Structures are given as structure tokens and as C-alpha cells.
Amino acid sequence: MSRHMRAPRFDPRAGFHAEGKDRGPSVPQGLLKAARSSGQLNLAGRNLGEVPQCVWRINVDIPEEANQNLSFSSTERWWDQTDLTKLIISSNKLQSLSDDLRLLPALTVLDIHDNQLTSLPSAIRELDNLQKLNVSHNKLKILPEEITSLKNLRTLHLQHNELTCIPEGFEHLSCLEDLDLSSNRLATVPADFALLSSLLRLNLSSNQLKNLPAEISRMKRLKHLDCDANLLETVPPDVGSMESLELLYLRRNKLRVLPEFPSCRQLKELHLAENQIEKLGAEHLQHLQAILVLDLRGNKLRSVPEEMALLQSLERLDLSNNDISSLPCSLGNLHLKFLALEGNPLRTIRREIIAKGTQEVLKYLRSKIKDDRTNQNDSVPETAMTLPSEARVNIHAIATLKLLDYSDKQATLIPDDLFDATKTTLITSINFSKNQLCEIPQRIVELKEMVLDINLSFNKLSFISHELCLLQKLTFLDLRNNFLSSLPEEMSSLTKLQTINLSFNRFKVFPEVLYRISTLEAVLISNNQVGSVDPQKMKLMENLNTLDLQNNDLLQIPPELGNCVQLRTLLLDGNPFRVPRAAILMKGTAAVLEYLRDRIPA
């Protein structure tokens, strides 16, 4: 907003202030001049112990250059300037803010996160135009009541402070859409929060909440509710009536039972990991028709209801670390991209099937549905034929599972007789794991028109031959626990590959060719020596939802990685970088990505 300087704010002695007293830390005049033109001033990361007076008075005092140059052109007239609307003074050492803050009434954005503030000035009430206020990562113990006077405020970030309570009158922030109170010391949430009728996103994670007010259900526009890492033992049944809710986070609490969700027909993600839930019934699932992500890991579930198969939109299901002994075969009819089952006492699915990943488990479950539909009392008994090489191949397994299995033989070569035995049979899966293979069998190319997944883990492969790159229908490739340090460029022809496991190899850089395989959904490259990743290229991998970089040599995580919003699971533990801190990593992928985005240079 360009305007002439208003008379009441003009100080005729302004040009002499600097000579009369110490003005404190200085700001380059070039920055101030640019700010008068653009209306924006960024002083982040300048080691400031206080805000220079010239910042507060940027639209009041006569600029220094006005005293030095009296022949202004029409584009340099100091009195025809822009009010400061955006002020960023984050990542400094500020312990307090002056009441002179009131001299910037046009501010719409004030970012003072990552300082040492213990309080906010009462003059903040005079910032009538303020729309976004970021005071996160400070040392605030209380909030001034004056903050509730900011009627135009839309975004308020207060995470990572020391707040124990919320001032009365918060409900007056009628325009507020995004409120982050995570990582404080709150024990209660005022019932009046329900009057925040415009709120779309509410983050209460990492506090000390033992319950939520039932009135929270009156937030009819709320889409994102995060209550992770609290002390919740129950959730008000009224939460199930929140019609606009899309994301609900309740991880790391003390929940034993779940509410029903009769009106949550927009709910896309339900995160319930690390609770004490013992039962999941049809009543909990029947209304979740839009659900994409269901995270139940680390609970005490003993069974999975058949009704889970009704969730036809479900893409990611995490049931790991429960007490589940069997799965309903109907799960095989789901269109899952990710299914986690580790840490369960499953008796009906072999470990090697689970190790091969989601699609193999679903395929196995579907095969069991067929078995159930046809009486197996007179089925063909499992038979085997002996090859001249003394290898044994299960003909029944090849015919029914379409699996060519020559695993755990400690073999250095795959016998030709094994390939000969499959000439008249459709093979979609190959398992040559746990051998001593130094190269990929050349005859694997004979199956290029049919094979979808290959397991070559636990061998001695030091390179990938071109034969593998010809299997263009491949969707799953397991190469973990080999001696690989690079991948050939020809692998870019694997245009249907969805999952690749490269863990426990010798990679020092993230394989460049993987950036060009746009179909990849999961890249597992933990326990290598990877020193860097390219966030710009990673962002172009639009289908990538799982990236495991644990236990590598990453000295820093580029902030731009936070722009890879397609990631649902990002694992970074066990690397030598210092930031993000372990506390951030523990909060999960969404928190890590947000942390990184906040540190992208303006």
C-alpha cells in the first residue's frame, strides 16, 4: 500500500535522533531502503539481541539518505513509501519486544520464531491488520490477553514454548484458521475453543492433555486435528460428528477404546499408533468411506474385522507391533500401496511372504479366498520333481502361486533345469534370495513378459546386469544385503517399478537413476553410506510416499526436502546430522517436513 507520510506520525527532529542517543544494533541502510519500497523486511539469523529502533520507526523517521541527497528523483521520494506489512526477525536472540511495535500498524505478517522471548508486549493489540503471527520456539509461559484483540488474525503459531494455559477471550479470534499449540505444557483446552468457528487446523500435540472438551465437536469447519503425544485415555464421542474432519492424529496416548465416526465421511487419515487399543470393530470402520491412511501400529489388537475390506479407498494400513495372529483373506481385495505387519505373531502367513512386501501379501490373501471358495478336500497334493542338478522345484507352488523359488540354497548359480521347468507356466514372482550369487542369472530375461517382483536379497551382487533392466513389468525389486555401490542408467526403463529395497549395501550417493523412475512409491536405502540427496529431484518423484534413509552418512538434511509433501513416511534416524533434532524426528514425517519447510531461506 503506497501512500504519503501521515502528518500525525511525522517527527521534524527525526533526522537528528541518531546523533542524540545510541540507537542500538544497526541495520544496513540498503535493507531499510528496500523495505520502504517493498513493505517487507527480513532480519532473520542476524544474532540480534534486540530489535533496532530504526526498524520500529522505519515509516516514521526521515531516512538517512534523505539528509545526504536532496535531489531525489521521482522514484526515490522518501515521503512516498510503502508501509511495512511483513517483518521477519526469527532465529535471533531476542528476549523481549518493545511497545514501539505499535509504530507498525500496517503489519500483516510478524515472524519472531526461534528467539528467547518470555513475553509479548501489550502493544500487540494495536496491530489491527495482523493476519499471521509466528512466535514458535521461544520461552513464553503466558500469553497477554491483548492477543485476543487481533480480530483479523488467521494464522497463530505458538508451538515449542512453555505455555500452561490459554487466556480468556481466545474465542474472539473469529478469523483464525490455523492454530498450533503443540509442544507446550497445556493440561486443559478451554471449552470456548468451540467458538473458533473459522478454524481449519488445530495442533495440540505434545502437551499434557488428559481429555478433550466435548464442545470441540462444534468446530464444524475443522479439517486437521492433531492430539499426538498427550495423556488422553478417551476421546469424546462427539468427535465422530465432525463432518469436515479430514486428518485426525491421536498417536502416543493412552487410548483403550475408539469412538465411532458416524459423520466423519471426509476423514482421509486416522493415526492411532502407540496406544492401548484392544479391539477394532465393524462399528469403528463402517462410516470411513473416504479413508486413505489407517495407522494402528503399536497397540494391543488381537484381530482384524472382516469389515476392513469395505474400506475400498484405503491405501496405507499399518498393523505392525500388535498381537494379531491371523488376517481376514478379504484384505486381499483392498487396493493397498502399503501394508505393515511386522511384530505380530502371525501364523497364517509365512515370514518370507511378508518380507516381500505389500503386493505379495495381498496376492497371497487373494489366493486364499479362491481356496476357500473351492473345496480343497480333493485338491491336488503338493508334489515335487527332482532335477538333474538335485534342485527341487515345487510344481504345485509354481502352478498356484506363480512363484519360482530357489532361495536359501547357498548356491552360486541357478540351475538351467529350473528355468526349463517353467517354460509352460506363467511366473510372476522370483525368489533367489539367500544364496551366493555374484551376478544375476542371464536366463531371467526369458521371463521378462510376466515377472512382477524379484527377490535377490542376501547374495553377493556387486553390479546389476542389463538383463534385469529388460523386465519392464517389474513392480517390486528386493536387492538388500548385497555389495552394490551403484545402479545402471538402464534401470530407468523399469517404468512400472513401485518398490525398491537397497538396504545394507555400499551406496555412497543416492542412485541418480531412481530420480527418473516416476512410478516409485517406496525407496528403502537404509544402512548404506549415502551422504546427500537432491531435494529438487526428489520433489519430482510425485508418487514417492516412503523414503527410508536410516543409518547413512547424512551430515545435513536440506530444508528443501520439506517441499516433498508427497512423502508419508520419511525415516532419518541413525545419521550424523544435528538438525532436525531427535525430538522432531520422533514426532513423525509430517512434523519433520514442516520443520524443514520453516527453515527454507526466504
Curated annotation (Swiss-Prot):
Residues where Phosphoserine is found = S71
Q: Tell me what this protein is called.
A: Leucine-rich repeat-containing protein 40
Comp. bias regions, Basic and acidic residues:
8-24
Identify the coding gene.
Answer: Lrrc40
**UniProt region (Disordered), positions on chain:** 1-26
Which SUPFAM superfamilies does the annotation name? L domain-like
The LRR repeat ranges on this chain = 35-58, 81-103, 104-126, 127-149, 150-172, 174-195, 196-219, 221-241, 242-266, 268-287, 288-310, 311-334, 336-356, 398-421, 424-447, 449-470, 471-494, 496-517, 519-540, 541-564, 566-587
The protein's matches in Pfam families, at most eight in alphabetical order, are given as: LRR_1, LRR_14, LRR_8
PANTHER family xref list: PTHR48051, RAS SUPPRESSOR PROTEIN 1
